[in-house]
């Protein structure tokens, strides 16, 4: 019998990161420098052979919109085909609310619960981390990408 797990995907930057969680605790992590559109089907095929997927989680932005779209379409398709619930939260959950590069000197920042763009002369390198324990309360069933973020520079 396969172990029941939840899967978390962070595909905002390279490398993509995937966490396997049992009872909300990280039991396996996977990183890949490959393009998410190429590697996600391979990784998830392996995961489905090894585990019984219960829930899917991902970072729905801000970040590379193309990477977010690929992740969303892939996970949403898997969610529908396999009847696995899909949940999302913003990327700030995975980088301790640090600024996230947008374009030029503009960065996405989260102030209170609002995501805005802000010009920063210098910003720390963005490092997204898989949490050791997944806090399910931080995620929502509203899993669509964060398209409501205004055009960069506005």
Region locations from a protein language model:
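Oxyanion-binding and handling regions
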Residues: 1-39, 49-50, 81-154
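Short, functional N-terminal and low-complexity linear motifs
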Residues: 8-12, 44, 63
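A short glycine/serine-rich beta->alpha loop
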Residues: 28-32, 60-65
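N-terminal, well-ordered alpha-helical segments
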Residues: 38, 42-45, 72-76
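Phosphate/pyrophosphate-binding loops at sites that engage ATP/ADP/AMP, CoA/4′-phosphopantetheine
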Residues: 43-55
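DPxDG-like acidic metal-binding loop motif
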Residues: 55-60, 66-86
């Amino acid at each position: 019998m396969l172990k029941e797990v939840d899967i978390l995907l962070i595909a905002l930057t390279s490398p993509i990161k995937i966490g396997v969680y049992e009872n909300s605790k990280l039991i396996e992590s996977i990183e890949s420098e490959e393009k998410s559109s190429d590697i996600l089907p391979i990784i998830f095929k392996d995961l489905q052979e090894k585990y019984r997927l219960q829930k899917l989680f991902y970072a729905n932005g801000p970040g590379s919109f193309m990477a977010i779209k690929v992740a969303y379409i892939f996970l949403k398709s898997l969610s529908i085909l396999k009847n696995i619930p899909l949940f999302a939260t913003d990327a700030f959950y995975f980088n301790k609310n640090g600024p996230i590069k947008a374009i030029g000197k503009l960065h996405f920042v989260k102030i209170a619960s609002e995501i805005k763009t802000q010009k920063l002369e210098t910003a720390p390198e963005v490092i997204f981390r898989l949490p050791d324990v997944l806090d399910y309360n931080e995620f929502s069933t509203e899993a669509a990408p964060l398209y409501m973020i205004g055009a960069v520079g506005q």
